[in-house]
UniProtKB/Swiss-Prot annotation:
<feature type="region of interest" description="Disordered">
    <location>
        <begin position="169"/>
        <end position="194"/>
    </location>
</feature>
<keyword id="KW-0547">Nucleotide-binding</keyword>
<dbReference type="GO" id="GO:0006229">
    <property type="term" value="P:dUTP biosynthetic process"/>
</dbReference>
<feature type="binding site">
    <location>
        <position position="182"/>
    </location>
    <ligand>
        <name>dCTP</name>
    </ligand>
</feature>
<keyword id="KW-0546">Nucleotide metabolism</keyword>
<feature type="active site" description="Proton donor/acceptor">
    <location>
        <position position="138"/>
    </location>
</feature>
<feature type="binding site">
    <location>
        <position position="171"/>
    </location>
    <ligand>
        <name>dCTP</name>
    </ligand>
</feature>
<dbReference type="Pfam" id="PF22769">
    <property type="entry name" value="DCD"/>
</dbReference>
<feature type="compositionally biased region" description="Basic and acidic residues">
    <location>
        <begin position="170"/>
        <end position="181"/>
    </location>
</feature>
<dbReference type="GO" id="GO:0006226">
    <property type="term" value="P:dUMP biosynthetic process"/>
</dbReference>
<dbReference type="InterPro" id="IPR033704">
    <property type="entry name" value="dUTPase_trimeric"/>
</dbReference>
<comment type="pathway">
    <text>Pyrimidine metabolism; dUMP biosynthesis; dUMP from dCTP (dUTP route): step 1/2.</text>
</comment>
<dbReference type="GO" id="GO:0000166">
    <property type="term" value="F:nucleotide binding"/>
</dbReference>
<dbReference type="InterPro" id="IPR036157">
    <property type="entry name" value="dUTPase-like_sf"/>
</dbReference>
<dbReference type="GO" id="GO:0008829">
    <property type="term" value="F:dCTP deaminase activity"/>
</dbReference>
<feature type="binding site">
    <location>
        <begin position="136"/>
        <end position="138"/>
    </location>
    <ligand>
        <name>dCTP</name>
    </ligand>
</feature>
<dbReference type="GO" id="GO:0015949">
    <property type="term" value="P:nucleobase-containing small molecule interconversion"/>
</dbReference>
Length: 194
């Protein structure tokens, strides 16, 4: 069951859901909380390899990922960051979100942005129970024109769903959790998987 606005506000007040900085109640709709774009980005750079071989050794895969991923790009609030047609860019929410072990979060991009060709969260929209940190966004510009985004703008919304019980292995207690406590646009750590 998804939490309604009243239950979201109650969970924020009681501290079972933590969003920092705490959102104003005006950005809590009937079923979700608006999230804003943060200041950290990473882009994919050109690479001489014809493809990314996910079956290669962990060391080789890690080396290739590091070579195609830019260093962190920090953009000041209100300044534009351009995403060009066909470009995949990582960003992060301005807010840090912490969930208890009995709630799962779901992140959706804004419909108004999708109608311009911008996919805000390409596939990984589930926020696991026990999650704590910024939420990395996988932007893809499927439109025909570059799109200028500005840190601080509303980029999406998160809603919360109660589970049938508390998770035995929430994200914050898993030894193999690759993105614990992230605060910036962290690139793929697929080479760290078993």
């Amino acid at each position: 069951m998804r939490l309604c606005d009243r239950d979201i506000i109650k969970a924020l007040d009681e501290g079972s859901i933590v969003i920092e900085p705490r959102p104003d109640n005006s950005v809590i709709s009937g079923v979700s909380v608006d999230l804003r774009l943060g200041n950290s980005f990473r882009v994919f750079q050109g690479h001489p390899a014809p493809y990314l071989d996910l079956s290669s050794s962990k060391a080789d895969l890690s080396k290739v990922i590091e070579s195609v991923m830019s260093e962190e790009i920090l953009v000041d609030d209100g300044k534009p960051f351009f995403i060009h047609p066909g470009e995949l860019v990582l960003g992060v929410t301005k807010e840090s979100v912490t969930l208890p072990d009995n709630l799962v979060g779901w992140l959706d991009g804004r419909s108004s942005l999708a109608r311009l060709g911008l996919m805000v969260h390409v596939t990984a929209h589930r926020i696991d129970p026990g999650w704590s940190g910024g939420i990395v966004l996988e932007f893809l510009n499927g439109g025909k024109l570059p799109i200028a985004l500005s840190p601080g703008m509303t980029i999406g919304a998160i809603n919360f769903e109660t589970m049938s019980g508390s998770a035995d292995r929430p994200y914050n207690k898993r030894d193999n959790a690759k993105y614990k406590d992230q605060t910036s646009a962290v690139g793929s750590r697929i080479s760290g998987e078993n």
